[in-house]
Amino acid sequence: MEQHGTNEGALWGGRFSGGPSEAMFALSVSTHFDWVLAPYDVLASKAHAKVLHQADLLSDEDLATMLAGLDQLGKDVADGTFGPLPSDEDVHGAMERGLIDRVGPEVGGRLRAGRSRNDQVATLFRMWVRDAVRDIALGTTELVDALSAQAKAHAGAIMPGKTHFQAAQPVLLAHQLLAHAQPLLRDIDRIRDLDKRLAVSPYGSGALAGSSLKLNPEAIAEELGFDSAADNSIDATSSRDFASETAFVLAQLAVDMSRLAEEIIAWCTPEFGYITLSDSWSTGSSIMPQKKNPDVAELTRGKSGRLIGNLTGLLATLKAQPLAYNRDLQEDKEPIVDSVAQLNLLLPAMTGLVSTLTFNTERMRELAPAGFTLATDLAEWMVRQGVPFREAHEASGACVRIAESRGVDLIDLTDEELSGVDARLTPEVREVLTIDGAVASRATRGGTAGVRVAEQRARVDAASTAHAEWARAGVRR
């Protein structure tokens, strides 16, 4: 078996007589996905250096040298001057190498005192996730704003509302669009709630048992923008429920986007004819010249399955690990990094797609009463006249049966046909057998009446603005 050679690039090796095999190293190396943590490694290392100094483990001069070296290393990481070498096992080893290159082994070699990769990576990963999900939250507000803008632009447009994908009741298009905004806002609520659990620092937990060097985990937590330090060092180094919760929140967001995408896919078909896609947000066919395909929506629908897979894979990784840290936990980062990357692609694309949709409101209005969508209004009119709903439901269903047999709408039934079904169906019932009247009558909170939808849009806009402000504020560090 080929040997890797030495333990150069690893943060261990004194107990070993030689380096790992090539296959072992290839399995172990992680810089191809954990390099995203490099900027956070610099921040955490600076905070760690300060507590080493407070514990009299670094002199004033060594601290100044180390902080200057870390600042330079951070700049070199940011501009691409410094990166991992093939011999680096992980981001932590690469960053220590970079620091030693800049300040020498005497000073650079002191930084590792009192910390383990176990508490280090758990902290850095939390820091990265906190920033990443804020970016996702901000992108989600932009999609919400696009839905709200289309709702405002088509405030009075009426469309068929559906249940079981069958004609149900007429609703405002704005009501339907805002119905997609609501779960997206809840997704941001979940991100913000998730941050409460992300904002606990594992730093200072060491490998699992804490540190004997009298360091100050609370000081590091505060400097790195955490709300508190962890209460239990074993849990802090080995728990990844914050990662699985993140995977769920991101998967749920993708699922909510997928539901919107599914409607867009249906609405742009000739059979529906509700919308026309912008050329900028659609594609064509290599063989069929007439095609304009909703690829953005289809990729959103497809990638939602990918994010669900990331969640289930991570849960399977975590399900049977004993305490404390196990190398299995190296598998925590790729699914989260991938889910974030996919959403960073999908959110601006879906926002662009939604904001450029052209709605065929005449077509929607034409189809709104199809399928006897005013049958409930007929029944509820009878209820307002004092008829028990059970009887009103039966009468309305009988009217539908007659209209269906004649191939006409409910409003086309004659007065004689209506009264023949039930004498209490007087000509006044025609007042509710219009889609405008039906929509306007549903004026309870959350309903489809124009005044209520306007209230909903105002609340959506206010929530989106507040979420965007939170996301832009970032983590205080």
From Swiss-Prot:
This is Argininosuccinate lyase. Keywords: Amino-acid biosynthesis, Arginine biosynthesis, Cytoplasm, Lyase. GO terms for molecular function: argininosuccinate lyase activity. NCBIfam families: argH. It is found in: Cytoplasm. It catalyses: 2-(N(omega)-L-arginino)succinate = fumarate + L-arginine. The gene is argH. GO terms for cellular component: cytosol. Its EC number is 4.3.2.1. GO terms for biological process: arginine biosynthetic process via ornithine; L-arginine biosynthetic process. It holds the Pfam family ASL_C2. It comes from Corynebacterium glutamicum (strain ATCC 13032 / DSM 20300 / JCM 1318 / BCRC 11384 / CCUG 27702 / LMG 3730 / NBRC 12168 / NCIMB 10025 / NRRL B-2784 / 534). Belongs to the lyase 1 family. Argininosuccinate lyase subfamily.
